[in-house]
């Protein structure tokens, strides 16, 4: 993970310090001037050494995730603020030269940006990640069987339970309690239960097994659930993937891998189908098989489709099926939102919320957790979907 951007991170650490050293530190006079400059550079040298630890580690992330989390926190604490200040100061210096003013107001703007950076960092790390919100949505369809009018589905995704190990276990218990408090008819987990490997799930089997719904808990596989984020032989990865699936079933969840089940209410029924993860086929596995998942399902059936990656909706689900409602996750809204805007909008057309195409809809959950314990403006989300039968007047 860090290895891929190591050069960029080192440049981000060094270049701002070169600017600050030249523009400010060299002006310091006196016997201790060199000592002060050395002290200023020490954190940067330390971050370069810390970065090199990841460069020589072939893993996507270290087995002890805290090593990565501490590093990323220090990047936000030390490197990003200096980048922001140096950028603002340099722009201000250029403007000062152009308009021939004495004051460099870019320095003031830079200080403000540093304070804002630290606010976002500390809030997202120590407040935002611990928050859970319940989001109510209503989906209406004339095709919904009458017996399912008012049917309640709780959707959650992207648990990344390994991030809760080491002091945050109570947060996952709170998620379970919040889900159960909704008295759902069905619960759908839209993938990414783990970060790297199934050993993260083992401590939480009893907790997650406590999720209750009248018609059960259904789940699908996410890209993190394949153990592709560890350096291991194909056999070890296959064993890990097998254990992840077995642990989900041990929790009482019904894992749907290109398959479906029928839920009945009297003579009426709906289909809950689940696809294997279906990403771009490059960075993310593309294994979804819509036809296999809906094999034997009537064209007149009402289908709720679960698929981790929302890009699959337009790529496969819309053209290859009649599934009326699709439930996805994956994006996390990049764990950063200001108002209704998220940088995820640069990457995903559908990144969070309810989206429609004619009478068909996609609901993308922004998830409850994350590989990195940070959320700003996008608290952990539990989506409560109430399905309503739309009455069509003749």
Model-predicted segments: where are they?
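Short N-terminal secondary-structure initiator segments
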Residues: 1-10, 98-103, 130-135, 159-172, ...
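Non-catalytic terminal accessory segments
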Residues: 1-130, 392
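Beta-strand secondary-structure signal
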Residues: 87, 136-138, 384
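Short, charge-rich amphipathic segments
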Residues: 19-28, 99-116, 138-145, 172-187, ...
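Hydrophobic alpha-helical transmembrane segments in integral membrane proteins
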Residues: 117-144, 163-167
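Soluble catalytic domains of enzymes that build or remodel membrane lipids, polysaccharides, and related
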Residues: 147-393
């Amino acid at each position: 993970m860090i290895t891929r951007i190591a050069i960029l991170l080192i440049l981000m650490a060094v270049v701002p310090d070169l600017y600050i050293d030249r523009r400010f530190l060299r002006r310091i006079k006196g016997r201790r001037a060199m000592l002060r400059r050395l002290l200023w550079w020490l954190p940067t040298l330390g971050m370069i050494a810390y970065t090199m630890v990841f460069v020589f580690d072939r893993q996507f992330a270290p087995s002890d995730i805290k090593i990565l989390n501490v590093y990323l926190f220090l990047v936000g604490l030390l490197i990003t603020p200096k980048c922001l200040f140096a950028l603002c100061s340099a722009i201000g210096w250029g403007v000062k030269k152009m308009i021939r003013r004495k004051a460099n107001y870019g320095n003031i703007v830079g200080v403000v940006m540093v304070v804002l950076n630290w606010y976002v960092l500390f809030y997202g790390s120590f407040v935002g990640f611990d928050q859970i919100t319940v989001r109510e949505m209503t989906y209406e369809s004339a095709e919904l069987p009458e017996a399912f009018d008012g049917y309640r589905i709780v959707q959650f995704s992207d648990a990344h339970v390994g991030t809760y190990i080491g002091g945050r276990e109570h947060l996952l218990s709170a998620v379970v309690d919040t889900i159960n408090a909704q008295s759902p008819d069905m619960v759908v987990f839209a993938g990414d239960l783990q970060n790297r490997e199934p050993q993260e799930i083992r401590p939480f089997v009893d907790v997650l097994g406590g999720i209750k719904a009248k018609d059960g808990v259904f789940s699908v596989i996410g890209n993190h659930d394949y153990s592709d984020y560890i350096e291991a032989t194909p056999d070890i990865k296959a064993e890990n993937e097998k254990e992840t699936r077995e642990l989900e079933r041990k929790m009482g969840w019904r894992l749907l891998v290109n398959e479906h089940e029928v839920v009945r209410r009297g003579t009426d029924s709906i289909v809950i189908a689940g696809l294997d993860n279906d990403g771009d086929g490059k960075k993310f596995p593309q294994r979804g098989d819509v036809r296999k998942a809906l094999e034997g399902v009537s064209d007149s059936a009402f289908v709720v489709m679960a698929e981790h990656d929302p890009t699959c909706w337009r790529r496969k689900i819309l053209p290859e099926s009649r599934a009326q409602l699709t439930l996805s996750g994956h994006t996390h809204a990049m764990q950063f939102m200001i108002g209704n805007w998220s940088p995820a909008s640069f990457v995903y057309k559908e990144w969070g919320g309810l989206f429609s195409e004619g009478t068909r809809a996609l609901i993308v959950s922004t998830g409850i957790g994350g590989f990195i314990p940070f959320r700003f403006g996008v608290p952990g989300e539990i989506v409560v979907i109430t399905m309503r039968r739309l009455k069509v007047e003749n």
